Amino acid sequence: MDFVNALKARLPDYAKDIRLNLDAVILRSSLSQTQAVGAALAAAFAAKSGVIVDAIRDDATLDDAHRAAALTAAALMGMNNVWYPFVEMSGDSELATVRPELRMNAYATHGGVDRQSFELYALAASIVGKCEFCVRSHYQLLKETGLTTQQLRDVGRIAAVVNAAAQVMAVESRVEEGALSA
């Protein structure tokens, strides 16, 4: 997983904890290597980090199916992480009973991978998207598939660290462009 070292090299000293956490949460996860990297890819997409998405997408850790599934799950969560909080924030009990009529056919095929992996990628993206309804839903489904609390904690840790790395890299790229003073 060369992408981890490539990402760590981009993080400045003030983000040393984030740099060290990248190793801990991805390379030493209780999840399978595929699931850990897929969760990182989905979280990077949700964090809108093209740099991290490209680094993971170019790495050979994920096969084409899991790469596509992580991106599909994250894209769907980009929609759902807005829709479901909107319904909740509206406070309209009638709206909560109306079908969203948003296309989500990828759920039927789990993005081309097993259901557990697809739900795990959706959870990682929803954590970054901060959709409480979505996090609860995916978390519960994953518990029902047999994932442990520790494994689900690791999804949260991956999402948190990837999100932090994305923020640091976004700011640092602006500093390099001269848009911000260091």
PLM-predicted stretches and their roles:
Residues M1-A182:
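Hydrophobic alpha-helical segments
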